[in-house]
Design a protein with these regions (language model features):
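Substrate-recognition/cap helix-loop segment adjacent to the acidic, metal-dependent catalytic center
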Residues: 116-145
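Acidic, Mg2+-coordinating catalytic module of metal-dependent nucleases/exonucleases
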Residues: 109-116, 120-121, 163-238
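Short, polar/flexible loop-turn hinges at active-site or ligand-entry regions and domain interfaces
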Residues: 81-85, 132-138, 187-192
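Short helix-coil transition/hinge motifs at the ends and kinks of transmembrane helices
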Residues: 62, 129-138, 160-167
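Short alpha-helix plus adjacent loop in nuclease-associated cores
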Residues: 144-168
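Active-site-proximal flexible loops/turns
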Residues: 22-24, 60, 121, 125, ...
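Conserved non-catalytic scaffold segment of RNase H-like nuclease domains
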Residues: 2-119
């Protein structure tokens, strides 16, 4: 860990990869098998970076793991575990470790791209493993903030982004982390790794770019702002 400058404000950026159960298709019932997180200041400087596979899911739920959206990446995980470049942690151990890091850096804000997903699946996992004896992954009072909403407010409404006019089949602008990082880094063919820590570092740079705009941003993970770019574009060409 770098020396802590107590004059700075630090935030935690987290990203998870999940496998899906079939408990209830009406809500997100994914369970986390990969956690990556880092501690950053508002300029995107990194102070802590960690990544784990979660033992109770990755090691003990073999059938479930085959449902993982990126199951084809599993051989990479096995190789990294074998050569020692990746570690395994229990979900309770991960929770305790992250809480300690947050205490050390006086962190009260956790950021993620589509943060509702990360929070829900982390809570799902701690409840699944502890049989609901523990119900929440982050310490009480933690503010969960959404980088996606922030990016939609201040990056994806920029004229240069809108003029690129990259949309999905429904006519909405593509605003996922892969697309936004490609935009701010001028890499039109950028592809996200979809491995916890690697994605964290990308999302931390998007977050820093958002902060650098010095504009009002929506951070609530339960408010959807992905329609904003289309609305802004329609105003621009009217």
């Amino acid at each position: 860990m770098k020396k802590i400058d107590k004059r700075k404000k630090y935030v935690l950026v987290i990203d998870v990869e999940t496998a899906n159960t079939i408990i209830d298709s009406k809500f997100n019932d994914g369970l986390v098998y990969d956690i990556g997180f880092g501690v950053y200041d508002k300029k995107g400087n990194e102070y802590v970076a960690k990544s784990w596979t979660i033992k109770e899911i990755f090691d003990k739920e073999e059938e479930l793991m085959q449902s993982a959206y990126y199951a084809w990446k599993l051989p990479r995980y096995y190789e990294e575990l074998k050569n020692g470049t990746r570690q395994t942690m229990t979900i309770k151990g991960a929770k305790k470790y992250i809480a300690k890091v947050m205490e050390t850096y006086n962190i009260t804000e956790v950021y993620a791209y589509n943060a509702k997903f990360d929070k829900q699946t982390l809570d799902n996992t701690i409840r699944f493993v502890t049989k609901s004896k523990e119900r929440y992954f982050f310490p009480y009072g933690t503010e969960i903030k959404d980088i996606w909403n922030m990016a939609c407010c201040v990056l994806c409404t920029q004229k240069t982004f809108l003029k690129q006019n990259i949309r999905n089949d429904k006519g909405n602008f593509i605003t996922n982390a892969e697309r936004v990082f490609g935009y701010i880094s001028c890499q039109s063919d950028f592809e996200e790794d979809h491995i916890g820590l690697q994605d964290v570092r990308i999302e931390a740079q998007i977050l820093a770019k958002c902060f650098a705009q010095h504009k009002h941003m929506e951070t609530n993970p339960y408010h959807a702002n992905w329609r904003l770019p289309r609305k802004k574009y329609e105003e621009m060409v009217a």
